[in-house]
Amino acid sequence: MPPKLIILDLDGTLWSHKDISSTRPPFTRIDDETLVDSANTFVRLDPCAGRLLESAKKKGVLLAIASWNNPDIALQALRVLGLDGFFDFPVVEPHPGKDRMVEKILAALGVDAEDAVLLTIQSTWWSWLGRGFLG
């Protein structure tokens, strides 16, 4: 059964940069997959990111973000890359409580945890998901 919801982390997952909050806007878009900040720091989308987002939307899969970042900076980067319109419920908050972010997303979108997939490179989330959502 395909997921009803894909929740994406940003740093090191959707894009190459490991901490978008450390960048210095404004951003300038270089091409479809790259932006640069005022300090000449480049941020590149993962090579599969665009296809994943487009495919999910075509199939009616909801998309959300759960990211520990400065919301102004992260959301500006998404806008400059033209990706903000893909997400049904972006949660970008300046704290490490991603479990609360995921719970907020599930509640807001009315999706059960077993119908959601979380994409992140952070292994600390895996153990939390196993305890809290997978039984």
Where would I find each of the regions flagged by the language model?
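Phosphate- and divalent-cation-binding pockets in alpha/beta enzyme and binding domains
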Residues: 73-76, 101, 127-128
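Conserved H-loop
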Residues: 84-88, 112
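Substrate-recognition element of Asp-dependent hydrolases with the DxDx(T/V) motif
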Residues: 44, 49-79, 89-96
